[in-house]
Swiss-Prot record:
It is found in: Virion; Host nucleus. This is Capsid vertex component 1. Keywords: Capsid protein, Host nucleus, Late protein, Viral genome packaging, Viral release from host cell, Virion. It comes from Alcelaphine herpesvirus 1 (strain C500). The lineage of its organism: Viruses, Duplodnaviria, Heunggongvirae, Peploviricota, Herviviricetes. InterPro entries: UL17-like. Coiled coil: none annotated.
Amino acid sequence: MDVHTNNWRYFHHGCDVMAHLVIPEDLIEGLYAEDRPKIFSCTLKVIDYQTNLVSEPVIVWARSIDHRHTVGTLTSGIALSIPLLLTNDTWHPFNIILLRFAETANHNACYVRFFYQTIFSGLIKAGAPPVEEVNHPPVELPPREDPLVNILQGRSGRQFPATEESTNDHTASQKLVIGEAASAYLNHRALERSPSLRGALAGEIFSSSGASNLSGSVPPANRQARRTALVNLVGTKDFTKDMLRLLPLTHCLSGKRFWLCMYNPEGYKNLVSCLNHLSEDELKKINPLSIIQQDTSFLTLKMNQFVDSLLEECRAANFRMQQVLGVAIRSDASNALEYVQEQFYEACFTLRCATNENSGWVKAAVATQSRKQGVWLDVISLWDQGVGSWGVSLKLPNPLPGLHTLACIQQLSCQLEGKHKYLLESVCAKDDQIAVLHSHTLNAWLLLPGGFAIKGKFTHSEKDLLHISSRYGV
């Protein structure tokens, strides 16, 4: 596979281990490979289990495989490579590999996580010799005689009982035909005797007269002369189908299968896990899902803080809401106030349970850390009535408002153009659906059906911003 070959050429000098993978598209939720080019890039980061720090991003090549571009017998999926580093010649099984596939014009970025344990266990298994080779030592076969060597050395392939008379006749006949062994010619006597015209063995063993320069013996015919390569291209290796070995692995976070591609017999069997050096008491303190739980808890905490800020704003305004968008409520509810209250209560409950890495507040935090501007919209369905949209970037021709006041939302709605021109109104005109408008200033507004808006805010420390940008930044 060309992608595996190129990744190996570009990255194998800067990493300790490189794993070549084929990942099925259904394992990468939200990939939409049909909207991407056949060859594209993705970003790889590693989250260290012990320090919870994220490595520098590495951009690797990926390819959508099909019937024309296959990996062995595989005709679908995404082929890519993962360059990895060791720590003191050991690897931690619970480090997390974070793959980020960039957003497209119509879809958000998507993330896939792998444990070191999954990848390295596959490498070790693939690098180990087959079981039959371990249990059954190789059988030594008796050496086979080469008839050509026998002819050059003056031996006959058929052996007869040797008598003094037959021995003398054989020796005499041999001397008459080819002479002594030391003066034997390598070319026919009717032709020129110079070996330079017919080729010579390495080192000019025979002189121009045809006699040997070495005393007593002719080099064996099966000895090959040493050749020195003119060009040695270190770091270039073409992976072919004949070298390929596919090893199925299971993605432990989803239970789906993907494939490890082994092209060369590298010695991965000597890779050592750092857990091998820990005592039994130390092993009991390890939580394999620590990083996953911390990231999920962090996202949930931020959403809870936002909902708390909404409730504080409502209490400060004595639970009075203002309608900022002139949208009628499309509902058969007899009491509009009770209807809006019901939508608000369900919105608070849903927001506390909803976490998404493509949420507008995540993109706003990344923009704040990198000193960029932007406005994003999250459309969230209530009562599980549909599928929402996360982190929709709103393009504005004029300078972006900071969304500090209600007037900013009205101004923003008037500036939207193209496919987003009536986006806010269309979202607020539907039942069982809410929207959250996010700004790079970390202000956020909850938009309810009917165009009612409540102001909230996300509060991030410097450590929080670094945490978000290191994981979800480009």
